[in-house]
Amino acid sequence: MTNVWNGMVIFSTTIIWTLLLVSIALVTFGYIYYLKWAKTPLPQLDDQHALFVTIMVPAHNEGIVIVKTVQALLNFNYPHDRYEIIVINDNSDDNSAELLANLQKENPTRSFKVINTDSVTGGKGKSNALNIGFKSAIGDVIAIYDADNTPEPNALRYLVAELEQNDEYGAVIGKFRTRNKDVNLLTRFI
């Protein structure tokens, strides 16, 4: 019986140390990658001739997070006359419509459009909301952000630069951070 216990202790100790070493390696290499990435220069774009981008944000009952998302989009380090923002308020029954209307009033000189759907045209999911937004889009490039994402100021510049530098690319994706990840069980799985 003591041989079994000794074997279990050795096995458990080995597993714990292995997991600890793997965790240390991941943190170390992650930090090294971060330091390397932080030194990457900002992509150079010809601001006069930058691609025109349509940014679409489908939103359903996202009043808690939509204001910060739109403000982050309005603050992009990208020529303001070279992108438009379309928020598709997909049949929300919270205060999303009011909040978005206030943002439009606060930013009258920006290309910022809100499409409010009703129970007939909306409420059929993200893909339907995006299809509604596509009808109004005029950009050479389409960027899609979820309503609970907060893109960093240079995010659009990096994405467009990547597309411009690689003719064979049809799409690119950037990293994101979700602000409401701890709100409920569903958002914890994101």
What feature does the model see in each segment?
Residues Q104, P108-T109, N116-K135, P153-I190:
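Long helical/loop segments within the catalytic core of UDP-sugar-dependent glycosyltransferases
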Residues M1-H49:
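N-terminal membrane-anchoring/stem segments of glycan-assembly enzymes
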Residues L51-T54, E84:
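Cell-envelope/extracellular polymer assembly enzymes that use nucleotide-activated donors
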Residues I142:
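Short aromatic/hydrophobic "clamp" motif used to bind/position activated sugar donors
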Residues Q71-R82:
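Short, acidic, metal-binding catalytic loop of nucleotide-sugar glycosyltransferases
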Residues E62-V65, S92:
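Donor nucleotide-sugar binding loop of glycosyltransferases
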Residues H80, N89-L99, S119-T121, T150:
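A conserved acidic beta->alpha catalytic loop
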Residues V67, D94-L103, N154:
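Acidic helix N-cap motif at the loop->helix transition within catalytic regions
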